[in-house]
Structure formats: C-alpha cells, structure tokens
C-alpha cells in the first residue's frame, strides 16, 4: 500500500515537472517570437524614416490611429518598393496622399442596402 502511494506520488511529481518544462518552453518561444516581431517592426520604422518626410510620417501615424490595417498595408508596400529599389526620392505628404487614395480605392468595400 505504501509502495503504491509512493508510486502515485512519483508519477504526479514527474507529470508536474513535465508540465513545468513545457510551460517554460512555450514561454521562451513566445518571448523569442515577440523579440523577432519587435526587431522587424524596428527595421520597418527605420526604412520609413529614410523614405518619408516628417509630414508624411505624421500623416501615416494619424491614418494608423483611424485605419491601422490600411496604414500597415501602406507601410509594407513602401518597404517593398524601397527594397526593390523603386523608391529613389523621399515621399512627401502629397505623394503619400495619392498612395493612400490609390490603395483605398482598390480595397474599398461598397455596402448597398436595398429596400
């Protein structure tokens, strides 16, 4: 009877250690993913600082407050164009407005209510 209780206790202890190990592994993986995401975001922001004028960056920041998905799409497109060498001069506020309008027109969804 005593051996059985000790065996059960040993099984519980092993299971607890295994769960703790898995939890620590998941936590480390999550921290690594967050660190990678922060690094990518820092790289994106560095590129945007290079290619956007201060006024254009301010406009993009305001767009991000209202339409974060649109702002993110514009950021990624600008970074891709920069990396492909297609952006040769800084983008000012007027150019950014045109880019935003073009992307908005392509992604706009129309809702029609019929009576």
UniProtKB/Swiss-Prot annotation:
What Gene3D superfamilies does the annotation carry? PDCD5-like
Concerning Pfam families, the annotation shows: dsDNA_bind
Entry's SUPFAM superfamilies?
Answer: Double-stranded DNA-binding domain
Name-wise, this protein is DNA-binding protein PH1060
Ordered alphabetically, the record's keywords are: DNA-binding
A GO cellular-component term linked to this record: cytosol
Annotated organism of origin? Pyrococcus horikoshii (strain ATCC 700860 / DSM 12428 / JCM 9974 / NBRC 100139 / OT-3)
Family, similarity comment: Belongs to the PDCD5 family.
Spell out the molecular function terms from Gene Ontology.
DNA binding
